[in-house]
């Protein structure tokens, strides 16, 4: 148990799923919580002490079924894998935590709503001002804000984070109140040092300063954002290059509504039995990306007259041109969730099939953009598109027409791309014919007919 106890000490707030052979095991209080949450058998293991240690586990192939249930129950889950082949090691197998899954750090489809974001937040206060940072690791969206409680509370209501990172030594009741039903995650106070936060952000974005992001006059927002990125690192979330920028939230650009206004307007739900929220009435979007965007628009109405005008002009164009607008809706309805698909690819959580689907989607978007060319209210959207023609051509030429979900399954690369790969495939598929060919060639070369 020495190895287990050492790893558990590194992740005291998480349920540690400890890989033992073909099972994930939990011990002690973790086992009690796991057995209760998953409704599995709780047993005991003799540890040589006066009392036996509680034990609960499940087969490793059931991880995708059980892990989301633990996270939905409000637990943080640390997944500990065997880092060596047990058959090749004498003694204790080396183990390590490879991933931490929390309510705010989730990629598993059963933990995410396709039509709404899943934000992880961080809060940091100094006097009357509060810094806020929000990231959705499944889409790469990253926001930061700074202001008094009256400004931060509406942002928290609009984004509704599922988990909030905070300074566990701060002791601020107002921050606790802001968290609402979100899962709290406390970090040590050194994580919230401004110099550390600035360096963390600058290193991530590869910039000398944060002025280009509009954060040079928002030190508390910088601290919150830096703490958020540190938390991702701590959770073994090593691949996060898809988080490419951070956007400053400002009260002058949007109408921010407090929790009472949102509730009374019934924007996202109804207090009446059988009732629905305004979002359910308005949402006729063609795909999950549109649904998440509409939810954002409803939670954060625009105040900028020019931005409002552009949006209204685009809607007016669609109403006046039903045929191209209808075809556009049909194409958008065909698309996969591009934001989350791209994130899975960037973080190494998917494979060739998603990559080909992404390339096909980009090609369809390019076709749609060509068809909509000349629609002046949409020009600002069309001009922002990168056709990625060379990338699409490479994917089309390299990947098989129906590649596997995972690269390890084989068959991802199309025939003719790599002669050596084609030769190995032929050997695997028809070794006898290859050997007969070699035999025939050697017989002809040597003049010996019966090799």
Which residues does each PLM region occupy?
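Charged catalytic and DNA/RNA-contacting regions of genome-maintenance
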Residues: 1-317, 330-346, 350-440
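Conserved interaction-surface patches within small, structured recognition/assembly domains
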Residues: 319-325
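Glycine/charge-rich, flexible interdomain linkers and switch-proximal surface loops
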Residues: 442-451
